[in-house]
């Protein structure tokens, strides 16, 4: 596991312990069972792809460990509406505070402002976080294979599926891909960013795509800035894209989203 992931896991487990002390698991699970109705994250993507269109998971992200502050003018509801107007299929909202200046409240506010399904983008280490995500309205969670062993990944996936949620499995290399393919979820994100070095190359997606079975929906993640990047990934069968930084840096987010999708189509 990389140094950055080790650091993140340490503070995440402290966060989880504090959250459990404040809100016991039974309480959060009850809230999850009575959360707002699911919107169907994977279904929204499948429907878009069925119409022969690219599917965009548009990300609301204030900052990152590698780039620092990305957007000072940060208004999650306004950004969510801008993405929806620009043609996004789903939203991804960073909820990690120490590394990304995110918050669960940002996800709640973004989801309330649109009709789009929402991914809680965070580092998941405990099924408690799954309950917490659903209790706050999330339709999908992220599992980073580099951060978890197989048993933990399986338990977290099962908790999400039991609640009717979707799961995006994220991989960066062949061993992680092989592990992810043993799980049930069909959404498979290929992260072009190396979480150890922060180097980003679309060649990662190009190298792994051929090993992904046809029943999986590949999602290109990181390093996607232009229609040419989308076209490059589309050539290896990737038609769903998670894009954050390049759109977050634009003054007119709706126009930038629309342009990215229009020129890529």
Curated annotation (Swiss-Prot):
Cite the InterPro entries for this sequence.
Aldolase_TIM (IPR013785), Indole-3-glycerol_P_synth (IPR045186), Indole-3-glycerol_P_synth_dom (IPR013798), Indole-3-GlycerolPSynthase_CS (IPR001468), RibuloseP-bd_barrel (IPR011060)
Query: What processes in GO biological process is this protein linked to?
Result: L-tryptophan biosynthetic process
Bridged cysteine pairs (disulfide): none
- One Pfam match: IGPS
Name the pathway it acts in: Amino-acid biosynthesis; L-tryptophan biosynthesis; L-tryptophan from chorismate: step 4/5
**Enzyme Commission number:** 4.1.1.48
- Coiled-coil portions: none
> GO terms for molecular function, please?
indole-3-glycerol-phosphate synthase activity; phosphoribosylanthranilate isomerase activity
Keyword terms, alphabetized: Amino-acid biosynthesis, Aromatic amino acid biosynthesis, Decarboxylase, Lyase, Tryptophan biosynthesis
Question: For this protein, what reaction is catalysed?
Answer: 1-(2-carboxyphenylamino)-1-deoxy-D-ribulose 5-phosphate + H(+) = (1S,2R)-1-C-(indol-3-yl)glycerol 3-phosphate + CO2 + H2O
Q: What class of enzyme is it?
A: lyase
Q: Which PROSITE patterns match?
A: IGPS (PS00614)
HAMAP family annotated for this entry? IGPS_B
Family designation: Belongs to the TrpC family.
| Name assigned to this protein | Indole-3-glycerol phosphate synthase
Q: Gene name? A: trpC
